[in-house]
């Protein structure tokens, strides 16, 4: 098969979590012998911020880490869709693309494109910003891949797409796995108690970070570290006052080695996900569990039963968060049991290979054929 992906960026994951899962999907397709071409805008804001924050050498590093990535950076006014889509069998268009490009690809498909065309939505805007999402012209698309049942239902209820399927994110377990601590970046940090990898959140979880991370860490006097971007000066001062080391942006593919240097991590979802998107944990949960680190999560509604009780610990209040942190640090054997259980669920149900299998089944269903025949196109 020839797969074509249009996305915001795979070269940069600066404040851009969609890159994590999509890199894993591309890698898995390639491991199965399929050709994958990726198109991203030359002026992608994630790339521009990465260059400003870490320099051009980070783009080179991404290519070294993912040597098989075939990424073309295009200018919107000169993109030749006939050339880009020539010979395509499956085309995925992520929702972080312009309304104009989404429509142009749909029109290309309507003019006789023989590929399967799917729109991929991994954001809360279909529930929280209906006006923006309703502006996408998906009339010529074969369907929508939604990263949660609530998103799928939203598309069907509003008539935005012909069909929609729930297609959750997952972990790239070739990259995200338990590993020894490394000093690749010239660092030699002692093993810490807790690490949080995540961005401040544009006021979507500022209070939650104060209540469920900064407060408990300060009261327990933990050796803690935070990686992420868009932390205002006030937030950095609060972290410092709590004794938390703020370490800035971390390339996503380095997360496993950072997890390996710490005894536990936490998940603090953004407010819109908890309030309006039940069943969607976001990519960080999958990746942390894949790395075999004990996880304490703020409560979120796992209404789709993605995980088993005990795969991670749940804290409904700041006091519960503090207690769960203390329990894991006090009882290493129990912490190891939690970590093993969480990783086992990822390996059994939530890898990028599982999602590629699901995507191939969806494609076969649309074509009225078997997966085997899809693969021989």
Q: Where do the language-model regions lie?
A:
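Catalytic binding pocket for nucleotide-activated donors in carbohydrate/polymer assembly enzymes
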Residues: 21-24, 40-41, 236-367, 371-377
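Carbohydrate-associated surface elements
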Residues: 150, 167-170
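Short amphipathic alpha-helix
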Residues: 18-29, 211-212, 359
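Conserved catalytic-core segment of nucleotide-activated headgroup transferases in glycan assembly
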Residues: 172-261
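A short, Lys/Arg-enriched amphipathic alpha-helix followed by its capping loop at the start of a domain
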Residues: 24-34, 215-220
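Extended catalytic core of nucleotide-activated donor transferases of GT-like folds
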Residues: 9, 15, 23-27, 37-155, ...
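Short hydrophobic "strand-cap" motifs at the C-terminus of beta-strands
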Residues: 6, 120-121, 147, 197-198, ...
